[in-house]
């Protein structure tokens, strides 16, 4: 009889008021502590190890941009890239054209060993193709499994 494998799904939701431009900036980052939902004995000072399944972002005041690019790093300076630059088309809301969302399918295992701080946090950077109107990175969500 085959062994049954159980996956545990987790998510990390962050909100913010970061105004995005057309280049990455260390001030425009969402910090996701992916160990926050783990039991205390598993998360204290632990490197993150899991499979990032997907990333969702929501922008507000986003009348002009049509595309968003994300990068996920192991450090706040953006020097240890775990998920390289990935672009997606923004989809406008049905009733609010300046509220736009994008979804990214990642599906890669990540083990935070590349010299980052090893604190279980991943740093989500974002930029847009047109910064007119000061689009805001209002929410981001990283879904992962162990």
Which sequence ranges carry the predicted segments?
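Short, surface-exposed linear segments at secondary-structure transitions and domain or protein termini
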Residues: 16-17, 92-103, 146
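Beta-sandwich interaction modules
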Residues: 97-121
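Ser/Thr- and Asn-enriched, surface-exposed coil loops between beta-strands
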Residues: 22, 26-28, 95-98
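Residues within well-ordered beta-strands of beta-sheet-rich folds
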Residues: 56, 107, 123-127
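Beta-rich globular "head" domains
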Residues: 30-73, 143
